[in-house]
């Protein structure tokens, strides 16, 4: 029984990475650019209907909504060779087409104004599913539409589809370069609040690390957005292979998420992938084995989150959970031996209060895509060092806030009217609590962490702001 997943692509970045994702899925399932099953795609065994549905004329249509407040990226998709792939009823571009001006408050406010139109589209897709499992949101946290409207949609999905899983692929800005979006720290912090409270699982796509990997591993001196988006689509398609080519384990989104997230708040995942297909020099000399792939996945240089490779406290940081999705010709006994070797060499430092084991899901490769490697692997991991990424967001926010810089841009919108900046303060508190919780995960007595505060809240003492506490223990 397929468990369908609806994808929401929001904003410029969300639509660009979403487009690459659908290109990759079409290749892997033998679907043409027009949505027609290719003559050679006869092997079966895959579940196309998790991400696609079949129209009356047998075309495969993505279960996707393309949403933006300005038309440029969606126009380019509608004029591309994949223009006949999408359901045109599932495309939303704001009438004025003026965008959100890189302002979270504008994106959020416009989300409120067009909620009915977008929720109608979501409801229609949901009603067309036999057994809807959840939603995937693709967006950036730094701009205006992906962050602001994306935040509004996360809250709306939580209200209307509270029993469905919400997973996000969230692109974090490059922190090594000066951004042309001066209010990026404000946008990021406000979005992080919603990702903490309203998502069940967040796959962090860190542009800082993606650029580093493109330069260091793929030897691309000045990576373009298209090249980093190609890395993102590789991660997205690999992370969904067990749903599309089901095996014994992790063949639905609930199973995938449950195995990785033992505590509800710590639901931010980092990824690693090897071997990267553009590493041409390595193609000739590397023999990919399960041990080689699993060992490389634990190396900092292959992790797609910058905080992992850059922290001084790396020795204290620990894995909360690891799931390796291994694709290709793999003998399960090789997996067992590889796990033993990794354990003997102590290559992964785990938390003390949970199972210190790497979970492995074996997945078939698409028979329609030729790759140079026998075995490839994706690591999805929860790791306490990710808190440094959030700490960086807080410190960048505080630099701007101290100067009271650019706040007038936000005061124009209802949430911040009458100089009410409590939303900023609340968001900062929630993100700081998240940082503290990841830090607490490193200690053996984490299970007791926060109990005193929760006791106070139950008895009516302490923080009564509601928003912070109402979702403790639930995500």
Curated annotation (Swiss-Prot):
Cellular component terms per the entry's GO annotation: cytoplasm; gamma-tubulin ring complex; microtubule; nucleus; spindle
GO BP, one annotated term: meiotic spindle organization
GO molecular function, one term: GTP binding
Binding residues for GTP: 142-148
Top-rank taxon, per record: Eukaryota
Stretches the record annotates as Disordered: 455-475
UniProt-annotated location(s): Cytoplasm, Cytoskeleton, Microtubule organizing center
Record keywords: Cytoplasm, Cytoskeleton, GTP-binding, Microtubule, Nucleotide-binding
Gene3D superfamilies referenced in this protein's UniProt entry, alphabetically: Helix hairpin bin, Tubulin/FtsZ, C-terminal domain, Tubulin/FtsZ, GTPase domain
UniProt keyword annotation of Calcium present: no
Coiled-coil region list: none
Role noted for this protein: Tubulin is the major constituent of microtubules. The gamma chain is found at microtubule organizing centers (MTOC) such as the spindle poles, suggesting that it is involved in the minus-end nucleation of microtubule assembly.
PANTHER family per record: TUBULIN
Family the UniProt entry places it in: Belongs to the tubulin family.
Protein name: Tubulin gamma chain
